[in-house]
Amino acid sequence: MVPGRPAQRPGPAPRSRAAQEDGTLTLTPGAAADGPSDSAFLRACRREPVPHTPVWFMRQAGRSLPEYRKLREGVPMLDSCMMPEMVAEITLQPVRRYGVDAAIFFSDIVLPLKAIGLGLEIKPGVGPVVEEPVRSAADLERLRVPEPDELDYITRAVRILTAELGSTPLIGFGGAPFTLASYLIEGGPSRNYEQTKAMMFGAPDLFAAL
């Protein structure tokens, strides 16, 4: 033991990886730890000793993978996010190929906007586009709070994944309120957020309500 350094407890056994014919790696679920809470990723999150530096990548499930491009061919982005089996498969693809230390749930931050009754689509090369931006109290009134069962496709996908991932943790994410509000106000991506700033300073109560 190194003087002045706390004793480290043994970490979980290394992952079991097997090479496939196409050169990718297969992760054996459950080989790395007793469960997700004992994984290298969550150990590192808790600042506990780990057997190796855990690795995962931003956008690890996506256009860089040929299997992703094949699966998504002809399927609009928002539609793919609302198909539980497809969400699960896309989420699992980089785990199978690279043996990363965590899976990232395949989704998009604008799904809640779709659920509250807005006309919304993701245009290639542009991003989320809202048909009718929210810029007045009357606009705000037409929005509604979705029922939980209207988002059941997310729950179903998570259930599939937790059954398939074994000891590999699943990372979820969500859009911050300001980000989602700016999409609603601007009607899409913006460089200067002029409409958002105008509401923030000109109608602060409306902005807070939104």
PLM features: what roles do these ranges have?
Residues 7, 54, 166-168:
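Generic structural signal for short, solvent-exposed loop/turn connectors between secondary structure elements
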